[in-house]
């Protein structure tokens, strides 16, 4: 737990120590233990890869690599230079609903009309949102700016086109790797499901490393944190109601709107995993 920079990992129980490669380098009071071979006690290797600066770990050694599955997705966002991001601040929440409630809420703008009438809806009209076709385990929600002539709040990364700098994007690599992207700022929603009816959430505010040199960097981070919190508080109230409805005895399946195409895409992916 926590964040560290160490050359050895030491178990707090019996003080066995391992190097960063997972090799056992110290095992106190093991002299005389018959058949004890330190080389046979190395830590197991967890499969991992680095994608656009994110370290992805997978306990299933048989799963296909991540990057080839999201090549089109990666090209869609290549101008945003995701690998240049740093985590400027992290917001933490606990929620009493299934993680899929959050993902579905994140990936459609239809609810802007009712949930965000004074925040998102005036800036990104629900009716203008669109979801491109997907060729892999991912989905992208593109929300064009309702005010395309207004300048960007933050200086955009070099090479970003005007529409990329002003429009808002939500994306998911299934099942729940969520990124909210606008210009130079990215919100990474990191989900930790705790069961069918709860999750922990960390919202990481990510900004380009070069923006850290700005004199008003702290104000930028604070302003982003306040806005992200305000939006999420609006979503919390909505998701609480959604969960109450989903767990009610008379709940049935409704019809998706064309604006909820991303949810449909996730459902198709889910069906593929189940067959």
Describe these PLM feature segments.
Residues 49, 54-275:
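C-terminal catalytic domain of Rieske-type non-heme iron oxygenases
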Residues 1-61, 67-72:
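Rieske [2Fe-2S] iron-sulfur-binding domain
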């Amino acid at each position: 737990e926590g964040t560290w920079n160490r050359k050895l990992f030491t178990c707090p129980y019996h003080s066995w120590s391992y190097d960063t490669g997972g090799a056992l380098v110290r095992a106190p009071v093991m002299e005389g233990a018959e058949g004890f071979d330190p080389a046979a006690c190395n830590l197991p290797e967890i499969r991992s890869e680095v994608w656009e600066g994110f370290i992805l770990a997978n306990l299933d050694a048989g799963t296909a690599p991540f990057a080839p599955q999201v090549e089109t997705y990666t090209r869609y966002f290549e101008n945003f230079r995701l690998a240049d991001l740093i985590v400027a601040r992290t917001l933490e929440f606990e929620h009493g609903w299934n993680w899929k409630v959050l993902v579905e809420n994140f990936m459609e703008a239809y609810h802007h009309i009712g949930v965000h009438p004074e925040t998102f809806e005036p800036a990104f009209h629900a009716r203008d949102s669109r979801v491109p076709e997907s060729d892999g385990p991912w989905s992208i929600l593109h929300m064009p700016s309702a005010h395309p002539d207004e300048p960007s709040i933050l200086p955009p990364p070099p090479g970003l086109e005007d529409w990329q700098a002003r429009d808002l994007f939500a994306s998911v690599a299934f099942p729940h790797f969520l990124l909210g992207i606008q210009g130079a700022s990215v919100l990474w929603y990191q989900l930790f499901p705790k069961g069918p009816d709860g999750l922990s959430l960390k919202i990481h505010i990510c900004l380009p490393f070069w923006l850290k040199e700005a004199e008003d960097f702290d104000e930028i981070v604070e302003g982003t944190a306040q806005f992200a919190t305000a939006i999420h508080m609006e979503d919390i109230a909505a998701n609480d109601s959604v969960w109450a409805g989903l767990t009610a005895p008379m709940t049935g399946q409704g019809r998706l709107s064309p604006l909820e195409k991303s949810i449909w895409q996730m459902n198709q992916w889910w069906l593929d995993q189940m067959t």
